[in-house]
């Protein structure tokens, strides 16, 4: 795609993007011939990735977009405050106002943009949709290719802290033989990837697209990893068992047995005979289903209706995103980290297109073993359980769900956004989980 001059008016720029079918409010430009220092250190020559089907990408949002964002923030009409002293009604007014004050005055998107542009990024078109991805080749020989998928309300930003530990383990206390070549795509409808104009982009379709992506990059043996939506997408890849895929690692497994899933959906008490760990998981899942899954219901049934407000008000969208990290992401992430993610959604106008993955998934559970058809997975599966996850998957359930479970570990800190919150810990477990597969030949 040709570069667009940032001197054009914001209105003209939007019209140009709409006519070209581009994705949201981003500016694309091919990188200069000279790589950044980071690119030189972390990846092989661009020619190893760039082909006729794979184009270099750099983000450069027009100044007008950032001016417009601050104008909208300044014009916010705030609601009244909550009538309780806790988070039971959602994000507290004072908390959000503090975040938004920073967003509208001191937050610097250009810093976030530079962080992305320090890494090799590309665009390729698969099944008519542009797929944006980061591709970092390890400096270590015999690195194992790994495709890693984000979730909602996350983005590629949630995975960036793992790039160093996974591609250059010796700089982070690891061994050279544990190195990965890392591919981090943006899910269709998210970030800089294209927004599908038709239906059918469910996790199975995305999984097939990821297989095409790895083939297009020349990888004949590789592994996959994911949490949140990255988990069912990686699980779908394992069910499809394409030639070259050696195994998967999940930090949000679909371990919930059918009888547990059924009891939760029906509002029944816990089945008899559960262990302490199983009963604890049941109670957490039951509470989440009753009080924490409202976002899934609305996005799974009416994403378009929801999107009108979220696409028009940055503060409304920020509140929606903020709420789904327990309403307190500041305990594990900095303000800048929270806002990097929120601002990426805003600038690419992907509130609706990202929500649509829930509709495409027919509002199905991503934690149910039967719904996710884990019985069809014969490839090796590694699982890491984080204590702050939506539920702590018991080993007994996970062994039952995945017949070829080769690695299971419970760690002592971290939550749903494991790669963001505990990148070193997750990276160490990804290394350990895939270590037995490194010398394995693909099917």
Model-derived features: positions:
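Non-catalytic accessory segments flanking enzyme active sites
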Residues: 66-137, 142, 337, 346-349, ...
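Short beta-strand element of the alpha/beta-hydrolase
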Residues: 143-151
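Conserved hydrolase catalytic core segment
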Residues: 165, 169-172, 219-269
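C-terminal subdomain of alpha/beta-hydrolase-fold enzymes, centered on the catalytic histidine
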Residues: 283, 290, 298-443
């Amino acid at each position: 795609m040709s570069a667009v001059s940032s001197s054009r008016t914001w209105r003209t720029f939007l019209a140009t993007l709409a006519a070209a079918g581009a994705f949201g409010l981003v500016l694309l430009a091919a990188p200069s011939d000279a790589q950044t220092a980071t690119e030189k250190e972390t990846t092989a020559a661009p020619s190893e990735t760039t082909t006729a089907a794979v184009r270099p990408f750099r983000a450069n949002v027009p100044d007008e977009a950032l001016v417009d964002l601050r104008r909208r923030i300044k014009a916010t009409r705030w609601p009244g405050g909550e009538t309780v002293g806790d988070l039971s009604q959602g994000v507290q007014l004072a908390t959000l106002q503090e975040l938004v004050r920073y967003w509208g005055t001191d937050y610097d998107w250009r810093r976030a943009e530079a962080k992305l542009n320090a890494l090799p990024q590309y665009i390729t078109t698969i099944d008519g949709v542009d797929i944006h991805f980061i591709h970092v080749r390890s400096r270590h020989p015999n690195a194992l290719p790994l495709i890693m998928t984000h979730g909602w309300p996350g983005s590629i930003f949630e995975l960036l802290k793992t790039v160093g530990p996974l591609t250059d383990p010796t700089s982070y206390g690891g061994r050279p033989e544990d190195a990965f070549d890392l591919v981090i795509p943006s899910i269709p409808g998210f970030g800089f990837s294209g927004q599908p104009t038709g239906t059918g982009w469910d996790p199975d379709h995305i999984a097939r697209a990821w297989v095409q992506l790895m083939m297009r990059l020349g990888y004949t043996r590789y592994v996959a990893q994911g949490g949140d939506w990255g988990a069912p997408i990686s699980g779908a890849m394992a069910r499809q068992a394409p030639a070259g895929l050696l195994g998967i690692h999940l930090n949000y497994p679909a371990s919930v047995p059918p009888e547990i899933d059924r009891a939760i959906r029906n509002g029944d008490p816990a089945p008899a005979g559960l262990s302490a760990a199983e009963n604890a998981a049941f109670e957490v899942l039951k509470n989440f289903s009753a009080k924490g899954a409202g976002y899934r219901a609305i996005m799974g049934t009416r994403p378009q209706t929801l999107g009108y407000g979220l696409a028009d008000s940055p503060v409304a969208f920020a509140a929606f995103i903020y709420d789904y990290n327990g309403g307190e992401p500041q305990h594990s992430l900095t303000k800048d980290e929270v806002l990097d993610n929120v601002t990426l959604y805003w600038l690419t106008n992907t509130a609706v297109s990202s929500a649509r993955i829930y509709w495409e998934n027919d509002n199905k559970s991503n934690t149910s073993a039967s719904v996710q058809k884990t019985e069809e997975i014969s490839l090796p599966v590694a699982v890491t359980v984080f204590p702050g996850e939506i539920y702590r998957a018991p080993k007994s359930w996970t062994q039952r769900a995945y017949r070829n479970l080769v690695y299971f570990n419970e760690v002592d800190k971290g939550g749903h956004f494991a790669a963001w919150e505990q990148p070193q810990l997750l990276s160490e477990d990804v290394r350990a989980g895939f270590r037995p597969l490194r010398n394995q030949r693909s099917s």
